A protein has these predicted regions:
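Glycan-recognition and catalytic cores of secretory/periplasmic carbohydrate-active enzymes
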Residues: 1-167
């Protein structure tokens, strides 16, 4: 087998795993069709272990679904799952100061904020990728806004609590 065939073989293996294993698992077991978004704590058999939702995972899931839609196959269910997570993020995951929560309940009630901007970065790439998938410029603008907010949070002294206290 030459290098090109070898790489093609692995690409097909990964695509097959994504489309026949990974995406169906999360769509069937993690997608919260009642409240929106995705449950983030599943056992290997798909059973729900905890109903709290990681906010950064909402952004990652929305991005993954839109990216797969844009680059693997035009699977409408993937686009719908991306939109579900994006709507959940928009409705429940931003605090009044623009900083995102780290964790919320299944219904979107805030549980915890962190000093990091992981939630913002994943939300920004999710909005951007969803905009590419749909052509809706609102989400491109939203991606840029969230990105600029994250930059501001990181560059504004005292906005994010220090990770350590100086001695």
């Amino acid at each position: 087998m030459n290098k090109k065939e070898y790489l093609r073989s692995w690409a097909e293996t990964y695509k097959n795993d994504l489309t026949n294993n990974i995406m169906p698992f999360w769509l069937n077991h993690g997608w919260d069709k009642e409240n929106g978004g995705i449950y983030t704590c599943l056992d290997r058999d798909g059973s729900l272990m905890d109903t709290t939702k990681s906010v950064w995972f909402q952004g990652r899931w929305a991005f993954i679904c839109a990216f797969a839609y844009n680059n693997v196959e035009k699977n409408q269910e993937w686009l719908e799952a991306s939109k579900s997570a994006i709507d959940f993020i928009e409705k429940y995951c931003f605090d009044k100061d623009g900083h995102m929560y780290f964790e919320v309940t299944a219904e979107g009630k805030p549980l915890r904020k962190r000093r990091y901007v992981f939630s913002e970065t994943f939300a920004a790439i999710a909005f951007a990728e969803y905009s590419l998938a749909t052509g809706d410029k609102h989400y491109a603008e939203r991606a840029l806004q969230v990105f600029h907010d994250a930059q501001r949070f990181l560059s504004t002294p005292g906005f994010l609590p220090a990770k350590y206290e100086p001695t």
